[in-house]
Amino acid sequence: MLTLIGMYLSYNDRGNLKKVLQNWPKANVELTVVTDGSRILGLGDLGINGMGIPVGKLALYTGCAGIRPEVSLPLTLDLGTNNGKLLNDPLYMGTRMKRVSEEEEGKYLDELMVALNEIWPGQVFSFRPCKLC
């Protein structure tokens, strides 16, 4: 049995976010927790290494609020990183580019919100540390 932890979307996926999101194998999503990894709990810009934040938040929502994990989507946006250590780390799995501008991120988030609402209308969104959130 395949156990899913979360989904990553790259800045390079822009223009195709809906198509990529449709690969999520769960038919129903009621709650999406999103991070861009830019401001992780005093640790700073962790890029895609920030996936633990949406996963952890959803675990908290499951344990404390009874949110069913099968209707949740932990989502990390790979919009680059300004962390030079990560950019130079050969083991870093994120896109090796400087973090996109606020204007570019805003356009990306607009496309993302439209796509998420078209695929799973009526869901709740929680943006955890994000540059624009």
Protein language model regions, located:
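Metallocofactor- and cofactor-centric catalytic cores in central/energy metabolism, strongly enriched
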Residues: 1-133
